[in-house]
Amino acid sequence: MTVQFIGDGNPDGTILQNLEAIRGDAAERRGGVLTTPPTATGTTTLTAAQMTGGVLVATPAAVATYTTLTGTLLEAALHDDIDDDDTFDLCIINLGGAGDIITLAGGTDVSIIGSATVDDAGADINSSGVFRFRRTTDNTFVAYRIA
């Protein structure tokens, strides 16, 4: 799996780093590789693959809470070169039925800023949510709802 960091803490913000060792693949340098996205159903603690895959396809059959990894486990899942202010995105797409709302909850040392709910596909509003996770210090992350 490849996750691309949006920023690296440098003021110019031009450096993009991959979570895995850079393969030298030109397509990867332009935007990464998206394989078949991981999935989730009912209430769960997300795995590293679900959090860092870029896209998570959800099919809950009822109201569900998806809890992030703890800050310590999330940092362990990322590459060794992660720095303060590095970021990665997670898009949750909710394909659940009417009323099957997902709430993203932060594990220990992970805070959510903005709306943490991803409404069902039948709702009048978006049934997906994009969260930008930013490392603030060792083993600590903030997830911003950006879309």
Name these PLM-found stretches.
Residues 3, 7-9:
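N-terminal accessory interaction module
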Residues 3, 15-111, 125-126, 135-147:
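Exposed extracellular interaction/assembly regions and N-terminal maturation sites
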Residues 109-119:
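Short aromatic-acidic-glycine turn motif
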Residues 119-125:
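Short proline/glycine- and polar residue-rich coil/turn motifs
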